[in-house]
Amino acid sequence: MLFLAPGYIFPHVATPVTVAIDFAQAVKEGAYSFLDLKASPVPNPELFQPPSRVSIGMTGGREERNEEIIRGPLNYLLSLPGKDIRGKLIDALNEWFRVPEDKLSTIKEIIVILHTASLLIDDIQDSSQLRRGNPVAHRIFGVAQTINSANYAYFLAQAKLADLNDSRAFDIFTKGLLKLHRGQGMELYWRDNLICPTEEEYVEMVSCKTGGLFYLAVQLMQLNSEVTVNFSSFINLLGIIFQIRDDYMNLQSGTMTKTKGFSEDLTEGKFGYPIIHSIHAAPNDQQLIQILKLKTNDEVIKQYAVRYIESTGSFIYCREKLDLYLQEANETFQGLELLLGPSKGIRAILNFLRTR
């Protein structure tokens, strides 16, 4: 997830040099992979005036080269194709919202930047080796440079809010990032202290971590739309389905093995959904907890762990819960269609989430 909650948009510098920040081309080329919050005015609305360029304290002719260096890890990950489920969701929702194209492009850029930055930090926090089938950024650029690039990216995304010309966007953005950090913080706490959460605690965490970024996009879209329907429940459901499916695929999918490594959640010591169920299904058996504690790369041990999870009925349970959540999401979707009309894009996303 995310690493640093951002503050104000433009730092005050003695001799600022204007550097254009434009991710639109990357978005167009597809080069990258819940709570209702009442918005309030930003501390200083003047910070939101166009043009949407970032002033940074660098002088002379080196700023362009320096910008490439600073953004190196970010640009590296942007260049690796991903599923782009968030971009597809934004496009699908816009069948209802009808956000103007320029505003929609800005919102996509913001979400792409935030998601990519969060992956840079995720991979460091999880000691990951692969991302999208390639070496993680910090193995190439180093940990310190990657952290700095990710943090820099949060402010790039924040600066893009000016293009929306709505001071409420700052409040939505800030509260959204706080929520994302809360979810990530709890997941890291459970992992590092070897505390297995309950299913309810897991769902609450996912609502912050995964569903939170989905809903941030929705809130920014609704600033530029006449549609005022509350989407929080539906988006929350999509986030839960997406994360449970991801946890399931991590332990069961050959495709996931190629892109992230075999059963990477076991190596990370992560309490994914099937693992949580398996531990609670046999609370007096310490085998799985001990394997998580090892954070092992040993495939023999990980294969045994997968068989153990299977033996507790946890994969069956996971599939059954996914079906229930998908049924609820489909019923909610049908209600939204009655209000707003059909959406082929949302239906396609729901169909995608059914595949395993």
UniProtKB/Swiss-Prot annotation:
Pfam families, alphabetized: polyprenyl_synt
Q: Which residues bind Mg(2+) 1?
A: 122, 126
Q: Which residues are Mg(2+) 2-binding?
A: 122, 126
Is this entry keyworded Magnesium?
Answer: yes
Q: What is its cofactor?
A: Mg(2+)
* Positions of Mg(2+) 3 binding: 246
Q: Which GO terms are recorded in the biological process aspect for this UniProt protein?
A: alcohol biosynthetic process; isoprenoid biosynthetic process; mycotoxin biosynthetic process
Keyword annotations from UniProtKB, A to Z: Magnesium, Metal-binding, Transferase
Q: Name one GO molecular function term.
A: geranylgeranyl diphosphate synthase activity
Its UniProt pathway annotation is: Secondary metabolite biosynthesis
Q: Which catalytic reaction applies to this protein?
A: isopentenyl diphosphate + dimethylallyl diphosphate = (2E)-geranyl diphosphate + diphosphate; isopentenyl diphosphate + (2E)-geranyl diphosphate = (2E,6E)-farnesyl diphosphate + diphosphate; isopentenyl diphosphate + (2E,6E)-farnesyl diphosphate = (2E,6E,10E)-geranylgeranyl diphosphate + diphosphate
Annotated isopentenyl diphosphate binding lies at 83, 86, 115, 132
What does the Swiss-Prot or TrEMBL cofactor note state?
Answer: Binds 3 Mg(2+) ions per subunit.
EC main class here is transferase
EC nos: 2.5.1.-, 2.5.1.1, 2.5.1.29, 2.5.1.10
Question: Does this entry carry the keyword Nucleotide-binding?
Answer: no
Q: Which InterPro entries match?
A: Isoprenoid_synthase_dom_sf, Polyprenyl_synt, Polyprenyl_synt_CS
User: Where, in this chain's numbering, is dimethylallyl diphosphate bound?
Assistant: 131, 209-210, 243, 250, 260, 270
> Positions of the site: Important for determining product chain length?
154
Q: Which family does the similarity line name?
A: Belongs to the FPP/GGPP synthase family.
User: PANTHER family under this entry?
Assistant: GERANYLGERANYL PYROPHOSPHATE SYNTHASE, PYROPHOSPHATE SYNTHETASE ATMG, PUTATIVE (AFU_ORTHOLOGUE AFUA_8G02400)-RELATED
Say what the protein does.
Geranylgeranyl pyrophosphate synthase; part of the gene cluster that mediates the biosynthesis of the indole diterpenes penitrems. The geranylgeranyl diphosphate (GGPP) synthase ptmG catalyzes the first step in penitrem biosynthesis via conversion of farnesyl pyrophosphate and isopentyl pyrophosphate into geranylgeranyl pyrophosphate (GGPP). Condensation of indole-3-glycerol phosphate with GGPP by the prenyl transferase ptmC then forms 3-geranylgeranylindole (3-GGI).
Report what the protein is called.
Answer: Geranylgeranyl pyrophosphate synthase penG
What is the originating organism of this protein?
Penicillium ochrochloron
